[in-house]
A protein has these predicted regions:
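Active-site beta-strand termini and strand-to-loop segments that position acidic
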Residues: 41-46, 104-107, 117
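Core segments of cupin and vicinal oxygen chelate
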Residues: 2, 9-52, 85
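Vicinal oxygen chelate
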Residues: 15, 70-108
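Short acidic/glycine-enriched loop/turn segments that link adjacent beta-strands
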Residues: 35-38, 64, 96-100
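Domain-length accessory/inserted modules outside core catalytic folds
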Residues: 40-48, 52-65, 72-74
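A short acidic/small-residue loop/turn micro-motif
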Residues: 98, 118-121
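Charge-dense, helix-prone N-terminal extensions
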Residues: 24-29, 48, 62, 78, ...
Length: 121
């Protein structure tokens, strides 16, 4: 049987800061019962069609770039500006002709990419 993605987990120094950023970015509420030690988005929805997001408190700051990142799609014209307004930072932009995307960091430095459409190769 093949694996499927259940959750996206992020280690955080400030759980609320990161969870609130992703809540606004994804347009979903932080789950009831979330705390300073652990928060989630979509975790309470047992019939979800997308992975839930989990935010785990850790005592130490990240010291290296994360080796896995999330690629997100937003067809809206202002996708990058909206995320910057929420607290993200642009790292670099890429355009290979048939596909373009922006590499960004959330307020605590978790790297992610955003594009207007899914890259199909």
């Amino acid at each position: 049987m093949a694996l499927s993605v259940a959750n996206v987990g992020l280690d955080c120094e400030d759980v609320w800061r990161v969870a609130n950023f992703w809540s606004a970015a994804l347009g979903q509420s932080v789950d009831e019962g979330s705390s300073e030690a652990f928060a989630s988005i979509g975790g309470a929805n047992v019939q979800r069609t997308q992975p839930a997001w989990f935010f785990h408190k850790v005592p130490e700051p990240a010291t290296t770039k994360n080796r896995v990142h999330v690629d997100l799609i937003d067809p809206g014209e202002n996708r990058v500006a909206r995320l910057v307004d929420l607290g993200a930072r642009v790292i670099e932009e890429h355009d290979i002709g048939v596909h373009s995307w922006t590499v960004m960091e959330d307020p605590e430095g978790h790297v992610f990419c955003v594009a207007a459409k899914v890259y199909t190769g």
